């Protein structure tokens, strides 16, 4: 089990690549513990080797799966208090902003 060892804890979704990866990397460089969530299992495995266990813990899954999110948050909460959520993961949508229903963004 990873330990945050007194560090602030951030959850970064979409952490495997791109902006999510860079946000996670920057937080780790500033002394944060990052719980990275992404569906890219191969890349998450690489990141688990790149960063130390007291810097990063990978969670592989889809944030649209409510049970996955609940289980991940429960596991992260056992590491320590969650100080920051960067909800970077998303699904492309091609609607104009006024065409969204509440269920689309829930």
Could you tell me what each predicted segment is?
Residues 2-33:
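Canonical Rossmann dinucleotide-binding motif of NAD(H)/NADP(H)-dependent dehydrogenases/reductases
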Residues 13, 82-90:
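Rossmann-fold scaffold of SDR-type NAD(P)-dependent oxidoreductases
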Residues 17, 90-93:
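Flexible cofactor-recognition loop at the NAD(P)H-binding site
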Residues 30-46:
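Conserved glycine-rich Rossmann-like NAD(P)H-binding loop of the short-chain dehydrogenase/reductase
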Residues 42, 60-71, 102:
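The beta1-alpha1 cofactor-binding region of Rossmann-like NAD(H)/NADP(H)-dependent oxidoreductases
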Residues 47-53:
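Short, conserved SAM-binding/catalytic segment
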Residues 70, 92-106:
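Conserved mid-core segment of classical short-chain dehydrogenase/reductases
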Residues 75-80:
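Glycine-rich phosphate-binding loop signature in dinucleotide/nucleotide-binding domains
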């Amino acid at each position: 089990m990873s330990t945050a060892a007194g560090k602030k804890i951030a959850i970064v979704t979409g952490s495997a690549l791109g902006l999510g990866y860079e946000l996670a990397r920057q937080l780790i460089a500033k002394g944060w513990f990052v719980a990275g969530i992404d569906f890219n299992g191969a890349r998450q495995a690489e990141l688990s080797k790149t960063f130390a266990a007291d810097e990063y813990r990978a969670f592989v899954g889809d944030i649209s799966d409510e049970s996955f999110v609940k289980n991940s948050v429960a596991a992260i909460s056992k590491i320590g208090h969650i100080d920051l959520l960067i909800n970077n993961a998303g699904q492309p949508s091609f609607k104009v902003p006024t065409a969204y229903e509440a269920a689309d963004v829930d």
